[in-house]
Amino acid sequence: MPGKELTDPCVDCADAEAILTVRCRRLCQDCYARFVNFKVFKRMENYRLRRNMSRTGPCKLLLPLSYGTSSSVLLHILNAQIQHERAKSHPSPGFELHVLVIEPSTVSTSSPPHDEGFDLLQQTFPSHSFTRVSLHNVFELDPSIQDVLSQFSSEGFTDDATMSDKDRLDAFRASITTATSRVDVDYILITRLVVAFAKKIECRGVVWGDSDTRLAAKTLANVAKGRGSAITWQVCDGMSPFGLEFSFPLRDLYKAEVQNYASFFPELAKIIIPDEPPSENILTKNLSIDELMMRYVQTQGEKYPGIMANVTRTASKLQASLVPANVPRCSFCGGSMLNQDGQIIMGGAAGNSEVRQGAELCYACTRSRPEVSY
């Protein structure tokens, strides 16, 4: 008996109705999910096969999860790949995941606590280890941050060690007045928290859930903020200044493609906190550079996805310059204190004579200080 005739067959399998157009190709749900999985599979191949690393012993990777779509989808995909590998009679050495959840309500006051989300994560992905922390736990995991706060902050801010860690961090963040500086500082704090935790549990690297769209926006924002040198580790796969490998397995997927994948799996809907739609009434001057670049990439990416993808591809070709071991690092962000001529620079050389004595801040961190406005 002949099969049912399809009105819009999938171009890959031709056995099911196509439901989505993926880069000019009509695919069914299964083929679409396979397309997304393969993009991530290629990026994790080195860890799966343990290329250029020991094939014995654990290979632990840390996955920071924000309950956002991208990091949740990355966990879902990597979990499926790990389970598939373990089911083989002769599996590859592979890797193991530890998931770090930074409670979103401690990062943004507009984000509600998501206790049920953490419980659902553990129930949905029982084969992995999970840890939940607050942003102010950076004091506990990275004690050196305490010395940096007074150096970085404005003259009117005094760090009170007798206060609770939460109150100390809230007071420090409240002293930062511009939107761009607040976002910049929060990103640095989150990175330092993630790095400190990864080192504590002896991870080899960190896998970030940044899509191509996010990486393109980050590239443009970093250049605008004077952090162009950080692109080699904030956008590119490879070694970071912290002695950990940074990887971005979703770098070949647009944000819309990641969102489509998430819609296929009901278990993710209860975990993911949806993004707030951008407000049309907010003034541009009240947006951070990061928010402006994300809006730009998202709107232009809908019209010209190939052009936006080229931003990330071009950035991924950048190579970090060889920095001598004795070159000082920025005490806040960890970047090297070298200018384009290879000369050591200090924060004061960036044009701000009010940097406190003893502070070793790079040019970009000097610009983010409360006394300096973008």
Swiss-Prot record:
Alphabetically ordered keywords of this record: Cytoplasm, tRNA processing
The protein, known as: Cytoplasmic tRNA 2-thiolation protein 2
Keyword Transferase among UniProt keywords: no
InterPro entries: CTU2, Rossmann-like_a/b/a_fold
Annotated Gene3D superfamilies: HUPs
Gene Ontology process terms (BP): protein urmylation; tRNA thio-modification; tRNA wobble position uridine thiolation; tRNA wobble uridine modification
Function per UniProt: Plays a central role in 2-thiolation of mcm(5)S(2)U at tRNA wobble positions of tRNA(Lys), tRNA(Glu) and tRNA(Gln). May act by forming a heterodimer with ncs6 that ligates sulfur from thiocarboxylated urm1 onto the uridine of tRNAs at wobble position. Prior mcm(5) tRNA modification by the elongator complex is required for 2-thiolation. May also be involved in protein urmylation.
PANTHER family assigned to the protein according to its UniProt record, in alphabetical order: CYTOPLASMIC TRNA 2-THIOLATION PROTEIN 2 (PTHR20882:SF14)
HAMAP family on file: CTU2
GO molecular function, one term: sulfurtransferase activity
UniProt pathway: tRNA modification; 5-methoxycarbonylmethyl-2-thiouridine-tRNA biosynthesis
Localization (cell): Cytoplasm
Main subcellular location: cytoplasm
GO cellular component: cytosol
SUPFAM superfamilies: Adenine nucleotide alpha hydrolases-like (SSF52402)
Family of the protein in this entry: Belongs to the CTU2/NCS2 family.
